[in-house]
Design a protein with these regions (language model features):
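Thiamine diphosphate
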Residues: 1-134, 162, 291, 296-325
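Flexible, low-complexity linker and terminal segments
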Residues: 1-8, 131-325
């Protein structure tokens, strides 16, 4: 049976199904409803409101170190408050899965700025996952947990206002109970003193290389990254809600590379896709996060000169600015 749910409601369901045991959050639109929808799952998930985003981040990280799968949520400006522990966790790694939701707000519907928090993933050198609809909001939580544990990394789970609040049909799965790994005292890993941080940094860089390879292989197999080949004339690289807009607007025969793992970018997959199309567009909201890196790799593409770097996109804007219709 399928259920009509918002992205936030579906994310809460994903937390339950992924076997996450601890969720801490600080309220703020567009993220608030995630934690609000968790108490219905009873004692399977311990959930709490924290006094601020930094505390929420630290509570969840403590649960991760102890071995539980852990989750915390906040709106995008809240990650400014939580940046200190997040960056340090990037160097220390995890025990149980550790997933941090940043709910971005293009067009400033309820926020004091329009910051693009994808840059936090690059700065903190951690993995980033972006769902594009309610079903993916649920499904990608489990994949984010698997990535976190396999690669010993926090995962930034980036949504946007439209992904959070738009509704779609969601097919449920069963909860998978996660067997918590035993906590082992490890001062080298979990005490990020300067000497330990110095030794951990090479491990972080190696982790990014492995994550990029994962994005080109396993992430395609499990549906996190999707390649949809058309007639080869036009190709679109996109992610998050922008995929929905582009999919509706571009004509039949258009090829799509839809990325769910958006940091690190799977550059070999992108090169292979670009080689199969005559003209390449990058469609994304706010900053040219993907576009800049793709162009830096020597891949010719068109993006922000058409779509701009402010405010939300929608089908009408993409149709007018990109296709000139």
């Amino acid at each position: 049976m399928k259920h009509l749910m918002s992205g936030n409601e579906a994310t809460a369901r994903g937390v339950y199904e992924a076997g996450i045991k601890v969720c801490s959050a600080y309220p703020g639109t567009p993220s608030t409803e995630i934690l609000e929808n968790l108490p219905q799952y009873g004692k399977d998930v311990y959930c709490e409101w924290a006094p601020n985003e930094k505390v929420a981040t630290e509570v969840a990280y403590g649960a991760s170190v102890a071995g539980s799968r852990a989750f915390c949520t906040m709106k995008m400006v809240g990650l400014n408050v939580a940046a200190d522990p997040l960056f340090t966790a990037g160097y220390m790694g995890v025990n149980g899965a550790y997933v941090v939701v940043t709910a971005d707000d293009p067009s400033c519907h309820s926020s004091q700025n329009e910051q693009d928090n994808r840059h936090y993933a690059r700065a903190a050198k951690i993995a980033m996952v972006e769902p594009s609809d309610a079903q993916e909001c649920k499904d990608f939580v489990r994949l984010a947990c698997e990535i976190s544990e396999e690669f010993d990394t926090p995962v930034l789970y980036r949504t946007t206002t439209r992904v959070c609040h738009s509704k779609g049909l969601v097919e449920f799965g069963e909860r998978t109970e996660h067997v918590a790994p035993t906590y082992a005292r490890n001062t080298r890993k979990y005490i990020c003193a300067p000497a330990n941080a110095y030794m951990n940094h090479p491990l972080v860089e190696e982790r990014l290389k492995k994550l990029e390879e994962y994005g080109c292989t396993t992430a395609v197999e499990n549906g996190l990254n999707k390649v949809e080949l058309g007639d080869g004339k036009v190709g679109v690289i996109t992610a998050s809600i922008s995929y929905q807009y582009a999919k509706e607007v571009f004509p039949e025969g258009t090829s799509f590379l839809k990325l769910g793992l958006t940091y690190p970018l799977p550059m070999n997959l992108i090169r292979d896709f670009a080689a199969k199309v005559e003209k390449l567009y990058v469609i994304e909201e706010l900053d040219p996060f993907m576009e800049d890196e793709i162009k830096a790799a020597g891949i010719e593409c068109v993006g922000k000169e058409l779509t701009g770097n402010m405010y939300e996109l929608n089908t009408e804007l993409v149709r007018e600015r990109v296709l000139g219709i």
